[in-house]
Amino acid sequence: MSLSNKLSIRDLNLKDKRVLIRVDFNVPMKDGAITNNNRIVQALPTVKYALDNGASAVILMSHLGRPNGEAVAKYSLKPVAAEVEKLLGKPVEFLNDCVGPDVEKACQSAKDGKVILLENLRFHIEEEGSAKVDGQKVKADAEAIKKFRASLTTLADIYINDAFGTAHRAHSSMVGVDLSQRAAGFLMQKELEYFAKALENPSRPFLAILGGAKVSDKIQLIENMLDKVNALIICGGMAFTFKKTLDNVKIGKSLFDEPGSKLVQNLVKKAAEKNVKIVFPVDFITADKFAPDASTGYATDDDGIPDGWQGLDCGERSNKLFREEILKSKTIVWNGPSGVFEFDAFSSGTKAVLDAVINATKEGATTIIIGGGDTATAALKWGAEGQVSHISTGGGASLELLEGKELPGVTALSSKN
């Protein structure tokens, strides 16, 4: 799967065409009101581009929450239609469903730059292909899925996917719209461009910073990165599994991943064979409990972490080692925070890595990608947007790309040639 060879909205003639855009309007809501409209704001450039380039209609489709394959009022996209209308400065027609004769008729007759938002795709089990009933997974009927996808396909002439955050899901709206031109919107295109730069043609030295809790959860990520990078920083909770297994460092009641510990020797051996330098933390900020109000302590590798205490962040000596490695690098991919940054007392390690990454950008590092999920949350918490090349919008999707997997939503896009 080449990331750099996918059709983009800029490659298409949109004049007098109905354009169906899969957006990600999965915004946080409270009591029917949107609490953060960032995802809607991010989708607007693609919508505006289609309108400015003569599209006869723009039809928007999205999911919201997890309604489990049935209509649930609190997951309706109706409040989102009002927000899109406000931000776009033009009327948005909201339809009470996303498929079926009424929806098909409304979309097929839309003209003069009309904007339509369909109801939540996940109100139908056919979107995800399954639902949970009484705790059991129930699969959607194969014929019903075909019919659902066929109905979506009749709504427009051109399909645009701008929902990178869902690109790792083989859902109907991601892979089942059977139009001849299927292209990436601006958000999707930006994600693909940056990941292509890092994974297909990186400037070197190439560094991966990998945090997170369990080695066993990140095994594919570490394996794939070892084939690509020059250096690897291992931080976060999974560092303790490496430290205890390799050097018998005392880790107190810090996170220890028993299944993951069995993989450590092979990973280190592979790194040596590939000439990849691994940098581990050497000191830690410790806590007597996992809580924001925990008492804090300090421990080094030599002394180890006392019984009853756990490491929740990397210490200053570790941060200095990480910074030195970061400032040497031209391409950096960061997935997984350095510590429990959600608790102020244990946030300085993650902040130090972020500061170093921003510094590296200023000093000429060409491509810096901060993976989605917790790492992106940390970066946004400290206002890093615009200070590094790219903060990914997709947690699961970015992780799967870094693991070397193909993303169904990307594979489904048309290639340029």
UniProtKB/Swiss-Prot annotation:
The keyword Transmembrane does not apply. It comes from Rhizopus niveus. Its EC number is 2.7.2.3. Its cofactor is Mg(2+). InterPro entries: Phosphoglycerate_kinase, Phosphoglycerate_kinase_CS, Phosphoglycerate_kinase_N, Phosphoglycerate_kinase_sf. Pathway: Carbohydrate degradation; glycolysis; pyruvate from D-glyceraldehyde 3-phosphate: step 2/5. The lineage of its organism: Eukaryota, Fungi, Fungi incertae sedis, Mucoromycota, Mucoromycotina. Monomer. Gene3D superfamilies: Phosphoglycerate kinase, N-terminal domain (3.40.50.1260). GO terms for molecular function: ADP binding; ATP binding; metal ion binding; phosphoglycerate kinase activity. Its main location: cytoplasm. Belongs to the phosphoglycerate kinase family. GO terms for biological process: gluconeogenesis; glycolytic process. This is Phosphoglycerate kinase 1. Pfam families: PGK. Keywords: ATP-binding, Cytoplasm, Glycolysis, Kinase, Magnesium, Metal-binding, Mitochondrion, Nucleotide-binding, Transferase. AMP binds at A213, K214, K218, G237, G311, E342. Catalyzes one of the two ATP producing reactions in the glycolytic pathway via the reversible conversion of 1,3-diphosphoglycerate to 3-phosphoglycerate. Both L- and D- forms of purine and pyrimidine nucleotides can be used as substrates, but the activity is much lower on pyrimidines. Negatively regulates the biosynthesis of acetyl-CoA from pyruvate in the mitochondrion. It catalyses: (2R)-3-phosphoglycerate + ATP = (2R)-3-phospho-glyceroyl phosphate + ADP. It is found in: Cytoplasm; Mitochondrion. (2R)-3-phosphoglycerate binds at V23, D24, F25, N26, N38, R39, S62, H63, G65, R66, L121, R122, H168, R169. CDP binds at G212, D217, G236, G336, F341. GO terms for cellular component: cytosol; mitochondrion.
